[in-house]
Regions:
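Charge-rich, low-complexity linker and terminal segments
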Residues: 1-19, 24, 94-178
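Charged, alpha-helix-enriched surfaces in structured cytosolic catalytic cores
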Residues: 28, 32, 71-74, 86, ...
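Short, intrinsically disordered, mixed-charge
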Residues: 39-43, 77-84, 140, 177
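A structural signal for short, well-ordered beta-strand segments
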Residues: 27, 51-53, 66-68, 87-95, ...
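Helix-adjacent hinge/juxtasegments
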Residues: 69-106
Length: 178
């Protein structure tokens, strides 16, 4: 079992249950928040980070739907060079009371989640952190194997495009030779 994460969120937007907005809301990360999010996700820089989200009460749960957009620099998985990248990702989350995700008393129990339960975020008290949930959605939207514009050149220069290379370990050996 892992210890709970006690770090302060890089981008917190607390939404009170008794004050849900009637219309879609736009959340934009400040320069400091973008810098901190970039550090969290191992990105050289985030230039723009925003989400437009609509919230709707469903009993004790709060459904959220919208779109997350971000423009950032990312290291190429092949060359390591930074390149400009972006995401435009739909966001659909349900904020549910934490007691609906009750602890099993320390016993690890394997459960199967339905499609509707996959994006549930538990909250405690009378508020939830929409900003942190959006930041987590961004982290999942980043392609960890993104290839920059120079990836093919680097692969060619290191002999990684040759058919006789013999798989992943041969690719590592080719990189070691250089």
């Amino acid at each position: 079992m892992t210890a709970p994460d006690t770090r302060a969120p890089e981008m917190s937007r607390i939404i009170k249950l008794d004050r849900l907005p009637d219309s879609a809301m736009r959340i934009e990360a400040s320069e400091d928040e973008r810098r901190r999010l970039a550090g969290r996700f191992g990105l050289p820089a985030i230039y723009d980070f925003a989400a437009t989200i609509r919230l709707e009460r469903e009993g004790e749960a709060i459904a959220s739907e919208g779109i997350l957009t971000a423009w950032f620099d990312q290291a190429c998985a092949v060359s390591g060079e930074a390149f400009a990248n972006s995401v435009e990702e739909p966001v659909a989350l349900r904020f549910v009371p934490a007691y609906s995700h009750a602890d099993t008393g320390g016993e690890e129990e394997e459960i199967e989640l339905s499609e509707d339960e996959l994006d549930e975020v538990p909250y405690e008290g009378q508020a939830f952190d929409l900003g942190e949930a959006i930041a987590q959605s961004f982290g999942l939207a980043i392609d960890p194997y993104a290839r920059g514009p120079e990836a093919d050149v680097v692969r060619e220069d290191n002999g990684l495009n040759e058919p006789e290379s013999g798989g992943a370990f041969a690719a590592l050996a080719a990189l070691r030779k250089n």
